[in-house]
């Protein structure tokens, strides 16, 4: 089912696709930023495959991300995540959404930078909180004060996310408006 209710500019999508060439477009950012939702719609607009790295990790491990964290700990999860990302980013073009901590892990960050153009969906705390506080599937938020934990993650991670090739502000607007902004950022990016 296509979530885009208004058509995305075909011209803009073509320009973005030309800019990408054979590279992947890799979405990074905190949980709740919209990496999967906007990534999936961006892939549709570009006519390329979409892969959610967390779903791929769950597929190969036959465990949920929460169960992996609980059973093996964050360090082992990050090692598996790095291996999965390396494999996913070997060929393109495709759109890949990553888990919130993927870009923080130095090994994963190297694979991501080598394998694609990075786009950070930067969101403010209140936007993220509104999106994530209704679910209990976020292992890092299983704390006494999850909103404070989210704010701490922002302080720790945002300087690293800022290394991304592109940044788009994630906020409460129609998804197709976000996709247009992503495509415009990609289309206007100068190839390195």
From Swiss-Prot:
CDD domains for the chain: SK
Pathway involvement of the protein, from the record: Metabolic intermediate biosynthesis; chorismate biosynthesis; chorismate from D-erythrose 4-phosphate and phosphoenolpyruvate: step 5/7
Any one cellular-component term (Gene Ontology): cytosol
Cellular location(s): Cytoplasm
Claim: Nucleotide-binding is one of the keywords in the record: yes
Cofactor(s) the protein needs: Mg(2+)
Presence of keyword Electron transport: no
Molecular-function GO terms, alphabetical: ATP binding; magnesium ion binding; shikimate kinase activity
Function, in words: Catalyzes the specific phosphorylation of the 3-hydroxyl group of shikimic acid using ATP as a cosubstrate.
Full protein name: Shikimate kinase
Source species: Rhizobium meliloti (strain 1021) (Ensifer meliloti)
């Amino acid at each position: 089912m296509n979530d885009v209710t208004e058509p995305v500019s075909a011209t803009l999508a073509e320009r973005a696709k030309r800019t990408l060439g054979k590279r992947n477009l890799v979405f990074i950012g905190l949980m709740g930023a919209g990496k999967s939702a906007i990534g999936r719609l961006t892939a549709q607009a570009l006519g390329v495959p979409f892969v959610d790295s967390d779903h791929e990790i769950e597929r190969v491990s036959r465990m949920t991300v929460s169960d992996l964290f609980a059973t093996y700990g964050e360090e082992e999860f990050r090692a598996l995540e790095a291996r999965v990302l390396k494999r996913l980013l070997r060929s393109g073009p495709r759109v890949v959404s990553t888990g919130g901590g993927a870009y923080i892990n130095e090994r994963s960050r190297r694979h991501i930078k080598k394998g694609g153009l990075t786009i950070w969906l930067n969101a403010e705390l209140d936007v993220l909180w509104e999106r994530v506080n209704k679910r209990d599937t976020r292992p890092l938020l299983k704390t006494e004060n999850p909103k404070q934990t989210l704010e701490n993650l922002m302080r720790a991670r945002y300087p690293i996310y800022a290394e991304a090739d592109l940044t788009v502000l994630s906020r409460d607007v129609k998804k197709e408006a976000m996709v247009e902004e992503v495509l415009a950022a990609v289309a206007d990016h100068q190839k390195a």
